[in-house]
Amino acid sequence: MKYQAKNTALSQATDCIVLGVYENNKFSKSFNEIDQLTQGYLNDLVKSGELTGKLAQTVLLRDLQGLSAKRLLIVGCGKKGELTERQYKQIIQAVLKTLKETNTREVISYLTEIELKDRDLYWNIRFAIETIEHTNYQFDHFKSQKAETSVLESFIFNTDCAQAQQAISHANAISSGIKAARDIANMPPNICNPAYLAEQAKNLAENSTALSLKVVDEEEMAKLGMNAYLAVSKGSENRAYMSVLTFNNAPDKNAKPIVLVGKGLTFDAGGISLKPAADMDEMKYDMCGAASVFGTMKTIAQLNLPLNVIGVLAGCENLPDGNAYRPGDILTTMNGLTVEVLNTDAEGRLVLCDTLTYVERFEPELVIDVATLTGACVVALGQHNSGLVSTDNNLANALLQAATETTDKAWRLPLSEEYQEQLKSPFADLANIGGRWGGAITAGAFLSNFTKKYRWAHLDIAGTAWLQGANKGATGRPVSLLTQFLINQVK
């Protein structure tokens, strides 16, 4: 899809003009101009009750005298001054549905005139593009009959302000990164294993002059003492690989990097602590943290942000066999702390703890890890907010700000010292689980023991990384949040 921002005349020929209208006869400048061009036709529709402005209601008009456009699509925007982000998304999706049904190839949108609460034109355009790209996404790689795709080729926003051009640039890059994250996450686990994840990182680095790649294999992990990471991998024939993508683009090449760490369990059966069979297929999504870091690295390379950023994809697979690690095992982690394994299905934190120690070598400005870590986070926050745990208030607030700006929502959970009590073991420095209560928090508390040398935040995306039911599939979250956070570091 090609997106443009430019001033257009209402008399310009096009497949379709999209126009927003509020309830209670609150009309925009363009509405009144079109009404004049069509000799009062739009006001006649209002008087007859056919055009109410009700939220996401669409009225499609064809071949209107006075307009060169083939069609005029009017969409209801609810009450003026009360339009929320969620309602705006409904409007965009309603418009997109009609455009697809009418095989529209080019559209000129006057939705730039819509007023959103606490949002500017930049946000209006960027969010519209991200919504369009997200809604149009199809994953039919393995279907013999491909899904019908939209023929829409050109989407023109009626404005020529500089904000609009930046919004298009950001939205295109972020949408590309989200798509990349969704594509990898939706791949079946018989194809997307740790080696596949490393191969995708290699392809990304080879296609970008700004990115370089180092892959750490099991032999190197063993030399480094990454015993917790390796223990998780022991039950699988697919070997573990940790892919380290480096984006070195700050004016000062020696500036401390921001490090993103993504949990990459390409399939998690739970190991010896085997998961229930129901919905186990969804455990291919246990690598969505790595997928989101991959998508974010792709995005920032496309945007050419003047930052130094390192993205680590911690690829691994957790399966049961005669060589698998067991409940009761005690592991010596890379930083020397010992961990008693009480549940082999609490494996993500074991992979992450060694990865978080590994990244100390980069002397990072800060580290953010992203993981589908706990079902407890889904119980606590549902599927709308990612869980945020951090030892640094400024970092946590910056991530929450980015979440608000993008509507890629997050909610901060507490991390007081009392939660460490639940992780005590009579036989080791730590237990890998902290009991039934506060599971999302105790998982974060566990990780905090391996982050003493830098500013750190943890995003638990177990509830937000994928959807179930009819719309089953990866969401690409939190690529938008992470990218916005990085954009804000430049400002």
UniProtKB/Swiss-Prot annotation:
> What is catalyzed by this enzyme?
Release of an N-terminal amino acid, Xaa-|-Yaa-, in which Xaa is preferably Leu, but may be other amino acids including Pro although not Arg or Lys, and Yaa may be Pro. Amino acid amides and methyl esters are also readily hydrolyzed, but rates on arylamides are exceedingly low; Release of an N-terminal amino acid, preferentially leucine, but not glutamic or aspartic acids
Its domain of life?
Bacteria
> What Gene3D superfamilies has UniProt attached to this entry?
Leucine Aminopeptidase, subunit E, domain 1, Zn peptidases
Q: Which GO terms describe its biological process?
A: proteolysis
Q: What is its EC number?
A: 3.4.11.1, 3.4.11.10
Which residues hold Mn(2+) 2?
Answer: K263, D268, D286, E347
Where does it sit, as one GO cellular component term?
A: cytoplasm
User: For this protein, what does the record note about how its cofactor is bound?
Assistant: Binds 2 manganese ions per subunit.
- Localization (cell): Cytoplasm
TM segments?
A: none
Could you name the active-site residues? K275, R349
Please tell me whether the keyword Repeat is annotated for this protein: no
Instruction: Write down the required cofactor(s).
Output: Mn(2+)
Which Pfam families does this UniProt record tie to the protein?
Answer: Peptidase_M17 (PF00883), Peptidase_M17_N (PF02789)
Q: What class of enzyme is it?
A: hydrolase
Question: Which Gene Ontology terms cover its molecular function?
Answer: aminopeptidase activity; manganese ion binding; metalloaminopeptidase activity
User: Which purpose does this protein serve, as stated in its record?
Assistant: Presumably involved in the processing and regular turnover of intracellular proteins. Catalyzes the removal of unsubstituted N-terminal amino acids from various peptides.
Q: Which family does it belong to?
A: Belongs to the peptidase M17 family.
Per its record, how is this protein called by name? Cytosol aminopeptidase
Q: What does the record give as the organism's lineage?
A: Bacteria, Pseudomonadati, Pseudomonadota, Gammaproteobacteria, Pasteurellales
Q: Give the gene symbol.
A: pepA
